[in-house]
């Protein structure tokens, strides 16, 4: 296989790995400050609130993925109309931002966060949560900046900007600590960090679009010199399946935290929250490659056999890398959790092992998630995600009776392996080849097209 593909796929992961000490130090310092100013018992719920954004990835309605694909295809074969697709995407996401802000404000006004999180929260805490979720809502349209950068093949820039979010969060936490803040106010820092990074990514993305305009026509960029008079909502045709995917993923992978907040003790929730934070650092190194893979596969849709070969190599590569990452979590997470919490929170080894299993499961599925991006393929993914979510919740609830938080992590790993990775092995080659035949049949409607399998033989 061409080594340039591996370089393109993993350059972002290498950059993330190089920057990992900075992000890790920022995360550890941020957690230490929050624990010191909220207390051990309150840290779990404050961290859960700060991670509410992870439960709302469907807020972009799948528009981000379609924008990445549109920009990636445009970079291979420039075509008119990119600006209309971008404006349609921004129109939809600005509407989503208004909806999130209004909904969050109403929930804070009527103190509805308390029953949702299963906690006895004060009126001021409810309002603080509403402010944080509103900031997250305003950051939703800004998320297209990273999507555009990935589509342009600048995954390295997207990764660098994503890492600044942790640094911004630490800066806001330090300011609040110096100002004498306490309690729920510290849940705002992650939302503010995300918003700040979004501003930077949006500015750079449209700067690069304008810079590359001579190769595609300056009028195609959203900030081009010619006025935009219409929207192209047809470009968002694959968003319906992406909405289901982005709802099903947090439902299967993140709901355990909410259920634990309602059924477990404060210490169990704090242990789970801290372990999830350590897991997120490890997973971010591997998941960074998904953006580059999305672009690589989108630009090679005309070569199905090559795409299938790349997918197979990536499954093996990610499987090996995730095994090392899981070993890291199993060996070091209990020690790291104790250091970060000043010995107050002890992560059980079984919890670390469960998250390690989840890391391997998600990594094995990651290449297929970036490969299957046509509307039909996304609908297949959507069905698999729903199966995954159902398995994750059912198995997690069953195991949590005896394993606590580890049961939810192990349930999620089971859901991903059975609901997503197993279908990948069975369906990916056929779906990729069928997609190529369908596109050619539309291009040559009068000809009979004979599909070939991934070894190049006629079926």
Question: Where on the chain are the PLM-derived regions?
Answer:
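Membrane-water interface segments that mark the loop-to-transmembrane alpha-helix transition
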Residues: 11-23, 61-113, 127-130, 303-328
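Interfacial segments at transmembrane-helix termini and the short loops linking adjacent helices
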Residues: 109-132, 266-270, 331-360
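Hydrophobic alpha-helical transmembrane segments
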Residues: 126, 130, 159-219, 391, ...
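Membrane-interface junctions at transmembrane-helix termini in multi-pass inner-membrane proteins
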Residues: 137-160, 357-387
